[in-house]
Curated annotation (Swiss-Prot):
Keyword Signal part of the UniProt annotation: yes
Protein name: Uncharacterized protein HI_0082
Organism of derivation: Haemophilus influenzae (strain ATCC 51907 / DSM 11121 / KW20 / Rd)
Disulfide bonds: none
UniProt xrefs under InterPro entries: AcylCoA_DH/ox_N_sf, AcylCoA_DH/oxidase_NM_dom_sf
Keywords in alphabetical order: Signal
Range of residues in the leader sequence: 1-22
Gene3D superfamilies for the chain: Acyl-CoA dehydrogenase/oxidase, N-terminal domain (1.10.540.10)
SUPFAM superfamilies cross-referenced by the UniProt entry: Acyl-CoA dehydrogenase NM domain-like (SSF56645)
Amino acid sequence: MGLTLKEHAEVCMALAESSASAGLCYMMSNVAVNCLNLFGSYQLKQKIFSDIVQNKTFAALAYSELGTGTHFYSSFYINMAWNLVKIM
């Protein structure tokens, strides 16, 4: 909608008043879209954003679960291979 982060938070809170799940889903979809917008390639943005708009889909975030809990990793490409660094 082109609004500010504060206004986005207000929309999330308003949705959550009626349904915490709806508020969380809305927020997480927008977080995923923002990550793609900031870091995705042009081709990936075209593919995902057109799917969201044309098919009314939602974006999502996924985390790996190694061992006994959810772990957050940052990936980087070096020496022709993907590498993961634990950040939490």
